[in-house]
């Protein structure tokens, strides 16, 4: 059984793939050699099912950044984090943001951690208010 951290990391790779291939969440998940853990599948399906709304939130709360111009890894992480904030109310805001920042620092650009933190904090202020 994967930890939530591992599930988020796996979901990041799959959400990146989802966009790169232009496939649905179910198509990406079906291509895996073994079924993912439940939380990974929840995140990937959540991002796939709510992508338009997630991108609307990201566009609304990002200052001077069009969603399509964000680095692809950041975009995938932000969609996952925004999904968790909006559809997983039992998760503490700090955990969602911290996990996304750690993954951004590990897999994206030098400035991504700060960007991901600031944007998810703005979204959390609205979604969890």
Per-region residue spans from a language model:
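N-terminal interaction/assembly modules
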Residues: 1-129
């Amino acid at each position: 059984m994967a930890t939530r951290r591992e599930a988020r990391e796996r979901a990041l790779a799959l959400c990146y793939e989802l966009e790169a291939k232009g496939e649905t969440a179910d198509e990406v998940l079906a291509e895996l050699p073994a079924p993912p853990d439940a939380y990974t599948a929840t995140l990937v399906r959540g991002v796939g099912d709510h992508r338009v709304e997630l991108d609307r939130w990201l566009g609304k709360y990002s200052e001077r950044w069009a969603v399509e111009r964000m680095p692809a890894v950041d975009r995938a992480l932000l969609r996952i984090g925004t999904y968790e904030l909006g559809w997983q109310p039992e998760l503490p805001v700090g955990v969602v943001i911290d996990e996304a920042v750690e993954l951004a620092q590990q897999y994206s650009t030098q400035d991504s951690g700060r960007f991901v933190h600031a944007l998810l904090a703005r979204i959390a202020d609205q979604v969890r208010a």
